[in-house]
Each structure stands twice: as structure tokens, then as C-alpha cells.
Amino acid sequence: MEADFVILSLTPILIGCFAAMACALPGNFLMLRRQAMLGDAISHVVLPGIVVAFLFTGSASTWAMMLGAGAAAMVSVLLIEGIRRLAGVEPGAAMGVTFTTMFALGVLLLEGSGAGAVHLDVEHALYGNLESLIWLDATGWESLVDPVALAGLPPELGRMAAVFALIAIAGFIFWRPLVLATFDEGFARTLGLPVQAISLGLVAAAAMACVAAFTAVGSIL
């Protein structure tokens, strides 16, 4: 029973926990800034970028997905700003139009490009593939100290743990300016804090967490 838990359940639980914590750290600040919808937007707009990156490189590597997601995020920012100015609508409405359009485009690309027949498909892109991230080389708890067994861990575990650690360390280092810029932007500006750079860094952290968690929990979750 213990061996079955280590093989089948331990790594999916750990990956899910790291994904939840990595997304929650920037997500809480986005909520406090009344930008909770931005988290939804980021997780949706990265989908077409990830699909296009996969089609160009033929690889589902982290760096290719990061570049594709970053490009999609920049396009989305331009679209949101363009819609807001040209149509004269509120930023929230422009954001809603943009992220639903980008998400639909990503699903269409998945269905029409043939990527689903290789490594990407709609179901896994939307809901992830957490149940398949098992540790086949494990024999029990003793495998946690076995270098050979540890080499067979799903790469998503190390990737998600590294992203969580990076975001947590950055949050610890920049905690004071981040809190000041979140709760009193005017006061933060008078102190000479780079408020705009802090906001961009927060969005970048959220995007990084979304891309890292994409394989495990998908675009929606």
C-alpha cells in the first residue's frame, strides 16, 4: 500500500501543491490590487502562445513554452490597450474580450493544427495531465534517498518546485516594496519606488507560474 502511494500519488500531490502555491503567491497580490481577473486573463492568453511555440519548435520544452507564452502576453496587452482606446470601453471589458478571443484561438489551433495527435490535445491543455505524472522508478519511501530512483522523477516536479522557490524568494526579497505598492501606490511613489516595474514583475511572476503549471493542471485550472 505504501509503495503504491509513493508510485502513484506522491508526485501528483507534490506537483499540485507546488502549482497551487506558486500561483497563489502572485495571485493574492493581484486580488488585493483588484486585478483578480488579470490572473484569469494570463492563464487563458498563454494558450495560443504555447501552441504556436510547440508548432514552431516541435518540442514541449519549458523555454519554448515560456517564449511563446511571453509573446502571447505581449500581444494581449497591445490588444487590450487598443480595444480600450478605440472602443472607449472600460479596461475590464477590453480584458474580457481579449482573453476569451485568445483562449478560443488557442483551442482552434490545437484542434486544427494536428498538435493534439503528438503531445498537446485540448483535454490536457484545458485540465492538465496530473494523474499521469507518476514515479515509476519508485519502490517505496526508501526511494526518496535512492539516487537512481530520484533520477526517474517526473521533470514537472523539479520545474514546479524551482518556479515556486524562485517566486517565493523574489516575494521575500521585494516584500516591503510590493506591499507598499499594493496598498498605497501614491505613498510608494513618494518614496521613489518603481511602482510600474513592481506591477510588471508581479504580472511576470503570475505568467511564469501559469506556464510552469500548464503541463500539470492545464490552462483553466
Residues of each region from the PLM?
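Helix-loop-helix "hairpin" substructures at the membrane interface of multi-pass membrane proteins
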Residues: 151-221
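Transmembrane helix-bundle core of multi-pass membrane transporters
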Residues: 103-170
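Generic alpha-helical transmembrane segments of integral inner-membrane proteins
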Residues: 17, 21-25, 71-78, 105, ...
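Short alpha-helical transmembrane interface motifs in multi-pass membrane proteins
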Residues: 8-12, 61-65, 167, 210
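Hydrophobic alpha-helical transmembrane segments
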Residues: 13-18, 66-71, 93-97, 157-162, ...
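Membrane-interfacial amphipathic/re-entrant helices at transmembrane-helix boundaries
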Residues: 1-22
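General structural feature for long, well-ordered alpha-helical segments within catalytic domains
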Residues: 79, 97, 122, 183, ...
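Short loop segments and helix-boundary regions at transmembrane helix junctions
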Residues: 28-43, 47-120
